Amino acid sequence: MTPFGYLFIDIDDPRATPSPAGRALAFGCARSRSLTPEEIGTPAHAHIVADTVRAAMREAQVGAEDVALVIVKTPVTSHIPATAGAVRNTRVTSAHSKAVGALGAGLALGEVPEARIVREAFDTDHTLHAKRAMVFSGSELDCVEIMLLANRPGAAGELTVHTGFLKDVLDAGGLRALFASAGCRIGEDGMLADPQKVVATLIKSGAAPDGRVRGLRTTMKSSHLDMDKHVRATMSGVAGSILGHARIFISANTVHQAPPGGGLCACIVRGGH
């Protein structure tokens, strides 16, 4: 609800010492080559995502077990003309591109079997999902861009990153569990007792395919307003009631990023576990 942004800056500080907790926040970035129009939305696209995630892990000097969150930006369509004689794919939707990106990230992290990265699975086989990926798509790029957040052993600093799942858009308990696991205290009123420890909160929230929440119909799939806007507004209220403010990054559509109707939440805390 509050317009703002998070800025990540990598600074070489000779005064920095390893975290007393033994690990601290590290991030890595990577960018793939340009995809051809024929590759976008295909298993080859997913493998390019996986390779780019692995490159970001190398840049951050971490293994898959250290990764807390992978942020993926992936192309929807391409402005590049189709190769002569090639058959261009039918239009790749935002949801389809996010599905490909999520399964590619899951492949790189060992969460999705390579044998199940097939065209028929994308945005269809919802038994498959990554566990630590938030995926975004756009027509303004023709490549895959990755930003990866991890807790690297021996890293300097006092920040750590933590990830958890949400059952649905009303799962306040899931958010409280995330903050508690990060070392924050929950007050008797259900709000954070030490909100100053939380320096960033990121949420990817979704809606079940039938639009129901806990068995009841909702208006989220009505035609007058995009469902993602309903989801973001609902999640803003739920998360804001715990944090005590609305400076929260919230996005919608969790295809292959969580079980259907569920979501992913992450926080960066200072002096946490």
Feature locations, PLM:
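Terminal domain-initiation and capping elements
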Residues: 1-273
